[in-house]
């Protein structure tokens, strides 16, 4: 998924506020499901974040175009671990440039029952979709 950096994404120094990288990653994950005409939840359960490891490399800034890349690191019965990277692929000036990594994260999600929040098996449909990433 690609997105552009807007004023609302930046801090007083004009660079992307650190928490927004996690928002970009979440949007990419959600967009993946939406493109399949599926919500990332069902009547029984929902994905919840268990843990996040984040690395910040070079700050992105206003007007740049970012590309969020997602890979499956591990898929088990009740959890999935995704590796997501964000690259700057275009500057605001639109001049050609070599892409560079700005952020990387490893995020572990559990699938839990909506009422009890206890772990339950990831539904077959979601596993099939995740394996297609």
Curated annotation (Swiss-Prot):
This is Acyl-CoA thioesterase YbgC. Keywords: Hydrolase, Lipid metabolism. InterPro entries: 4-hydroxybenzoyl-CoA_TE, HB-CoA_thioesterase_AS, HotDog_dom_sf, Thioestr_dom, YbgC/YbaW. It comes from Helicobacter pylori (strain ATCC 700392 / 26695). Thioesterase that may be involved in phospholipid metabolism. Displays acyl-CoA thioesterase activity with lauroyl-CoA (C12:0), myristoyl-CoA (C14:0), palmitoyl-CoA (C16:0), stearoyl-CoA (C18:0) and benzoyl-CoA, catalyzing the hydrolysis of the thioester bond. Has low activity with butyryl-CoA and octanoyl-CoA. Belongs to the 4-hydroxybenzoyl-CoA thioesterase family. It comes from the Bacteria. The active site is at 11. Its EC number is 3.1.2.-. GO terms for biological process: lipid metabolic process. Homotetramer. May interact with CagA. It holds the Pfam family 4HBT. The gene is ybgC. One of its GO terms (molecular function) is fatty acyl-CoA hydrolase activity. The keyword Hydrolase applies.
């Amino acid at each position: 998924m690609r997105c552009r950096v807007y004023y609302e994404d930046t801090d007083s120094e004009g660079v992307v506020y650190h928490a927004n990288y996690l928002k970009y990653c979440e949007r990419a994950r959600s967009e993946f499901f939406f493109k399949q005409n599926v919500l990332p939840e069902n009547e029984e359960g929902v994905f919840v974040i268990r843990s996040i490891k984040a690395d910040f490399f070079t700050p992105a800034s206003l007007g740049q175009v970012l590309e969020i890349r997602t890979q499956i690191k591990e898929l088990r019965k009740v959890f999935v671990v995704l590796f997501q990277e964000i690259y700057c692929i275009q500057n605001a000036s639109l001049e050609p440039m070599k892409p560079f990594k700005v952020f990387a994260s490893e995020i572990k999600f559990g699938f839990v029952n909506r009422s009890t929040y206890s772990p339950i098996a990831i539904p077959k449909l979601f596993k099939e979709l995740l394996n297609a990433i």
